[in-house]
């Protein structure tokens, strides 16, 4: 087995020291992929065909984190929660490298560009594109089918059918990629 491609399955995902079993309510679907170095801490749900990539950290300390079916959290992302602010990703969501999500909700088939930040109480609709490097401030609502970017992010226009299809392609690509990594680990 190639150590650089070694992933962590639901069976061997380690509980970090000091995380406390009283909040360890992890539910990891057998088809979910967790790459080596990723940390899944406390109250986190990984649904069917979801994936969490290298060195990402998901900390469901005070509330739950849900990674929806077919969604992917790419390398070096941080997902956290706040009091009464769970983080919920719908189906087919792509979270780009180095992104920080904190107590927010993201709708189905949405792309969050690399190095973006989404804060407590923010709600991103379905079929959205959040441009790389964007900041979605506390409590901001981005409606379905929107393209938004900037610091702070502003809605620029509606997404095109081609962009919606691209979001689906990205999510499907990571489902296939995770399957290849999982197979390489056998």
What residue spans do the PLM features occupy?
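Glycine-rich hexapeptide-repeat left-handed beta-helix
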Residues: 18-28, 61-69, 75-77, 81-82, ...
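Methionine residue identity
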Residues: 1-4
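Generic preference for hydrophobic/aromatic residues in regular secondary structure cores
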Residues: 6, 25, 56-58
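Exposed boundary/loop context
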Residues: 11-13, 53, 143
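Short, low-complexity, charge-dense intrinsically disordered segments
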Residues: 7-17
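N-terminal segments that cap or nucleate solenoid repeat domains
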Residues: 22-52
């Amino acid at each position: 087995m190639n150590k650089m491609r070694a992933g962590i399955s639901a069976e061997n995902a380690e509980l970090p020291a000091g995380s406390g079993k009283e909040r360890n309510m992890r539910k990891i679907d057998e088809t979910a992929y967790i790459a080596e170095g990723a940390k899944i801490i406390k109250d986190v749900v990984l649904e069917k065909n979801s994936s969490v990539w290298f060195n990402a950290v998901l900390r469901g300390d005070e509330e739950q984190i849900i990674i929806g079916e077919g969604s992917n959290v790419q390398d070096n992302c941080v997902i956290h929660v706040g009091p009464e602010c769970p983080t919920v990703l719908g189906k087919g969501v792509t979270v780009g490298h180095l992104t920080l999500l904190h107590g927010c909700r993201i709708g189905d088939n949405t792309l969050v560009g690399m190095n973006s930040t989404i804060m407590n109480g923010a709600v991103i609709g379905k079929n959205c594109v959040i441009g790389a490097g964007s900041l979605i401030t506390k409590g901001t609502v981005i409606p379905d089918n929107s393209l938004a970017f900037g610091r702070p992010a502003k809605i620029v226009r509606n997404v095109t059918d081609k962009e919606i299809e691209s979001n689906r392609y990205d999510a499907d690509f990571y489902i296939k990629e995770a399957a290849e990594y999982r197979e390489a680990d056998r």
